Swiss-Prot record:
<dbReference type="InterPro" id="IPR044810">
    <property type="entry name" value="WRKY_plant"/>
</dbReference>
<feature type="compositionally biased region" description="Acidic residues">
    <location>
        <begin position="154"/>
        <end position="165"/>
    </location>
</feature>
<dbReference type="InterPro" id="IPR003657">
    <property type="entry name" value="WRKY_dom"/>
</dbReference>
<keyword id="KW-0804">Transcription</keyword>
<dbReference type="GO" id="GO:0005634">
    <property type="term" value="C:nucleus"/>
</dbReference>
<dbReference type="GO" id="GO:0000976">
    <property type="term" value="F:transcription cis-regulatory region binding"/>
</dbReference>
<protein>
    <recommendedName>
        <fullName>Probable WRKY transcription factor 65</fullName>
    </recommendedName>
</protein>
<feature type="compositionally biased region" description="Basic and acidic residues">
    <location>
        <begin position="47"/>
        <end position="69"/>
    </location>
</feature>
<keyword id="KW-0238">DNA-binding</keyword>
<dbReference type="Pfam" id="PF03106">
    <property type="entry name" value="WRKY"/>
</dbReference>
<dbReference type="InterPro" id="IPR036576">
    <property type="entry name" value="WRKY_dom_sf"/>
</dbReference>
<keyword id="KW-0539">Nucleus</keyword>
<feature type="compositionally biased region" description="Basic and acidic residues">
    <location>
        <begin position="1"/>
        <end position="17"/>
    </location>
</feature>
<keyword id="KW-0805">Transcription regulation</keyword>
<feature type="DNA-binding region" description="WRKY">
    <location>
        <begin position="68"/>
        <end position="134"/>
    </location>
</feature>
<dbReference type="GO" id="GO:0003700">
    <property type="term" value="F:DNA-binding transcription factor activity"/>
</dbReference>
<feature type="compositionally biased region" description="Polar residues">
    <location>
        <begin position="18"/>
        <end position="31"/>
    </location>
</feature>
């Protein structure tokens, strides 16, 4: 009996040794290649991506549709919002933005309000931009040159004096050509002829012949008839401005001039 049991055990040990024998060369080569690939392959996980957190004072968004939604502060990049979701333990949602300055840029950021200080905004940047820094509006437009001041036009001097002279000239011409004025001053033109006749009359010629001293005054009396007195009886005294007046009598036929 004992001999049979020993033979059975030895048989089982032989089979187990064959099963657990040395590995074949094919299996060892396969395991080595698998370990090499696993050592050189990068770990693609979200935790390996570098993140940068920035605290910025909050700016309330005017006309916000969602309660607690905030507008991220400007950082010279163009961003486009593509999602939003609530956060556990916080009354404020989290917004997700991607860079829209250049197509295909991997830069992302998350914007949310701080739980501890609601007046602050937490901005988490992930990835980096693959394009140069965008130009600001001031550098893009450039300083505009100031417009040069336009010279003020000099005021034109109106020829007022010449116009007034022309007015007086026109008025003078009108007076000369008016027939009523011609009749009114006709006596002044006849004064030369009458004065010349008076000087040539025999009365004044006889006075030259008589010798009179320089100190004595010479008085000339002209005879005046009754008819002449009756003609001038109804007339009043002439004003002082009258220098010359003239009287003609058809009966006597004499002409008297008084200066």
């Amino acid at each position: 009996m004992k001999r049979g049991l020993d033979m059975a055990r030895s048989y089982n040990d032989h089979e187990s040794s064959q099963e657990t024998g040395p590995e074949s060369p094919n299996s060892s080569t396969f395991n080595g290649m698998k370990a090499l690939i696993s050592s050189h392959s990068p770990k693609r996980s979200r935790r390996s991506v570098e993140k940068r957190v920035v605290n910025v004072p909050m700016k309330e968004m005017e006309g916000s549709r969602h309660k607690g939604d905030t507008t991220p502060p400007s950082d010279s990049w163009a961003w486009r919002k593509y999602g939003q979701k609530p956060i556990k333990g916080s009354p404020y949602p989290r917004g997700y933005y991607r860079c829209s300055s250049t197509k295909g840029c991997p830069a992302r950021k998350q914007v949310e309000r701080s739980r501890d200080d609601p007046t602050m905004i937490l901005i988490t940047y992930t990835s980096e931009h693959n394009h140069p820094w965008p130009l600001t509006s001031s550098t893009r437009n450039g300083p505009k040159p100031k417009p040069e001041p336009k010279p003020e036009p000099e005021p034109e001097v109106e020829p007022e004096a010449e116009e007034e002279d022309n007015k007086f000239m026109v008025l003078g011409r009108g007076i000369e050509t008016t027939p009523s004025c011609v009749d009114e001053f006709a006596w002044f033109t006849e004064m030369e002829t009458t004065s010349s006749t008076i000087l040539e009359s025999p009365i004044f010629s006889s006075e030259k012949k008589t010798a009179v001293s320089g100190a004595d005054d010479v008085a000339v009396f002209f005879p005046m008839g009754e008819e002449d007195e009756s003609l001038f009886a109804d007339l009043g005294e002439l004003p002082e401005c009258s220098v010359v007046f003239r009287h003609r009598s058809s009966v006597v036929g004499s002409q008297v001039e008084i200066f």
